[in-house]
Amino acid sequence: MISNNRLRIAMQKTGRLSDDSKDLLTRCGIKINLHKQKLIAFAENMPIDVMCVRDDDIPGLVMDKVVDIGIIGENVLEEEVLNRQVQLDNCSYTKLKRLDFGICRLSLAVPINIEYNNIHCLNHTRIATSYPHLLKRYCDKKKLTFKSCMLNGSVEVAPRAGLSDAICDLVSTGATLEANGLREVEVIFFSKACVICKTGFISLEKKNVIDKLMTRIQGVIKARESKYIMLHAPIEKLEKVMNLLHGAENPTILKLAGDNTRVAMHMVSSETLFWETMEKLKLLGASSILVLPIEKMME
């Protein structure tokens, strides 16, 4: 049985967000033994319990206050909000943080042999989807009349099977659409993974754990977005070197032993350092340029 004194987190058991969610908790220093056979896992070093469930159950578990925190895709979250609004059910939650994984878009796609000029080409058509409420909201805004064909999987095969004229489904790279003779024509919703929290009373003990967890999550994301840069540069070119390194904090500048014309620069940059930038740095006289990943970061 899950203790009321421990923070309860719901995450996807298997699927698109599962591995990234597990990796996030691990990088946050939470020691937890997650198995596919287990519904609940208990952290060893923090008062945290993790429930591994279907992704479309997570919003409801948070909104019904069964768990305190959920890691979920915004597409699933928004679909459940719209569903609960129709059912006149509670759909309250607090979004704590958008994450840096689970990036996708919900799009309309049509067979490649169909002429498409604008959204009204889909008027009075049948559209297959796993997201009927998001689709309806978008089509209502566009004043589009359509018939929904609800499918819980393999939506991309619906036109070829004669079930629909078009589909509304998640797209990451577009490779699945192309493999099934479809092309993306409209994006109706952009989505990333996010951390959500229940509304209402939360004990001080749990609030402290949430604050600690969110600080660590922010540190993990910041570290993944940043690089540690070290280089040697001519003193007279320092300003030009800094101008090339957009997104970098004020550098640490150190004297080089036996060289009064050059210094060592150490800095954290929040932007990707491309080969072209490194080549420009070299033209300015920089040398020994190192770009290193950052494992952990706290501001």
Swiss-Prot record:
Pathway: Amino-acid biosynthesis; L-histidine biosynthesis; L-histidine from 5-phospho-alpha-D-ribose 1-diphosphate: step 1/9
Cofactor: Mg(2+)
InterPro entries xrefs: ATP-PRT_HisG_long (IPR020621), ATP_PRibTrfase_cat (IPR013820), ATP_PRibTrfase_CS (IPR018198), ATP_PRibTrfase_HisG (IPR001348), HisG_C (IPR013115), N-reg_PII-like_a/b (IPR011322), N-reg_PII/ATP_PRibTrfase_C (IPR015867)
Entry EC number(s): 2.4.2.17
Enzyme class: transferase
Chain segments annotated as coiled-coil in the UniProt record: none
TM annotation in the entry: none
Subcellular location: Cytoplasm
GO biological processes: L-histidine biosynthetic process
Keyword Chloroplast appears in the UniProt entry: no
Summary of subunit composition and partner proteins: Equilibrium between an active dimeric form, an inactive hexameric form and higher aggregates. Interconversion between the various forms is largely reversible and is influenced by the natural substrates and inhibitors of the enzyme.
HAMAP family on file: HisG_Long
Role summary: Catalyzes the condensation of ATP and 5-phosphoribose 1-diphosphate to form N'-(5'-phosphoribosyl)-ATP (PR-ATP). Has a crucial role in the pathway because the rate of histidine biosynthesis seems to be controlled primarily by regulation of HisG enzymatic activity.
Name of the featured protein: ATP phosphoribosyltransferase
Source organism (scientific name): Buchnera aphidicola subsp. Baizongia pistaciae (strain Bp)
